[in-house]
């Protein structure tokens, strides 16, 4: 019998579309993982639409759900995955749950996308309350094993600006020293060696050699920019990175190539379908730009490698 690998995913849920748990659960299941989803919010759709309705889970309600799992002795996990959170007390409760689960299973891996903000027109802007930053910096990152910040979030966490690849590598080393063994800066403003049509991502993984010494693998990836605003891509990225680092535990290069290549296929299919629906010269709507997840099942399962990572 194949060994079961179980993920506790604490993220947002939408009725229509693919963000948060909706973007993470399907790919993880396709790749063979059991996923237990806690929905931090339940909205009709993501907030990029003109309207949305729904409910938000508070920290007491999160505790209640977790207590239910505990009472039935079904709170054994191999992974915890978290993404967008707006509430400080909710985030602190997540940390408490992760710490308790790690006491039960010291090999548990916590994958955290520290969603706080992004760069718009060259200026960084936070889209969560400012009081979340110290919680991420002091409580979340120290218990995380894999983190997937964008450049702006990596700068916030370390207090260091990134203007070059060298500075990005230094920032990743600072993040390693805060706790996580694997750091992937999922997008940056750095100029790619391949030109301005490409988006650059960087990764760094620390592993222990049999003699106890620490080995660091650093990689760079360049992805062709797509002229559209997608929502849920970070959630999909973190979920697939979880899956592929599990399957290739000491090879960040291969794990990232598979993750980014699958992303490429999903986004290309999405933009093609969106343009076909919107018509020539018309900007696709948020509904038309929802990720074509189900249609991309084969690409998620066994992605054709179209993005090669460079080992630095």
Swiss-Prot record:
It comes from the Eukaryota. It is found in: Cytoplasm, Cytosol. It is an enzyme of class 2 (transferase). Activated by K(+). Activity is increased in the presence of Na(+). Keywords: Acetylation, ATP-binding, Cytoplasm, Kinase, Magnesium, Metal-binding, Nucleotide-binding, Phosphoprotein, Potassium, Sodium, Transferase. The active site is at 235 (proton acceptor). One of its GO terms (molecular function) is ATP binding. Pathway: Cofactor metabolism; pyridoxal 5'-phosphate salvage; pyridoxal 5'-phosphate from pyridoxal: step 1/1; Cofactor metabolism; pyridoxal 5'-phosphate salvage; pyridoxine 5'-phosphate from pyridoxine: step 1/1; Cofactor metabolism; pyridoxal 5'-phosphate salvage; pyridoxamine 5'-phosphate from pyridoxamine: step 1/1. Pyridoxal 5'-phosphate binds at residues 12, 47, 127, 232-235. The modification N-acetylmethionine is found at residue 1. It catalyses: pyridoxal + ATP = pyridoxal 5'-phosphate + ADP + H(+); pyridoxamine + ATP = pyridoxamine 5'-phosphate + ADP + H(+); pyridoxine + ATP = pyridoxine 5'-phosphate + ADP + H(+). Its EC number is 2.7.1.35. Ubiquitous. ADP binds at residues 150, 186-187, 223-226, 233-234. The modification Phosphoserine is found at residues 59, 164, 213, 285. GO terms for biological process: pyridoxal 5'-phosphate salvage. This is Pyridoxal kinase. The gene is PDXK.
